Amino acid sequence: MNSVKRYLWFSQASLIICLLICYLMLPSVMDHNGGASNFGDGFPTVIPYALGFALSAVLLWVAASKLSQMEQKIRKTAALVTTIGVLDLLVLLTTFDRKANHVYYLVHDYLGAALFAYEFALSVWIVYKTKSYATGLFLLVGSIGSLLGLLSLVGPLRLLFAGQMIGGIGFGLVLTVGFPSVIAALG
């Protein structure tokens, strides 16, 4: 169980740290209300951007592999973690072609929306299962970040990347703190 928890932490930390490195390399993304995907557009930020998403996906799959080796009730949760990794990888892969034409752009945006929706739904489920004040607070943080991102897309705010980061940190905390509690309750 400890190895699953460790891989979940590393998956979320690698993504957040790599995106923060991207921001330090190219802070102007915030000036143009750009999202994290803009870091995948060119050198030098494409390297930590791709590394962050790829590492996150691989580490999530390792955690899922460990879950799939546990008792039957726990094994079923491996698919929940695998799905996040698949969506992370698809968002990464569609980043590079999104400016080629409108179809690629839409595919990337819809996959990003699917990742957000899945992470939000999973977070709500984890909070419901744990009934923990801490995971509820982390869900609130993620929701505030997501709201900032949404208002940046449709309104006057220019905080898309900040909203994505706050939302991602909130989800990462729900996943790394709450999900192991759900697994422990099943075992």
Labelled PLM ranges:
Residues M1-V4, S65-A78, Y128-G136, L186-G187:
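Membrane-interface helix-boundary motifs at transmembrane edges
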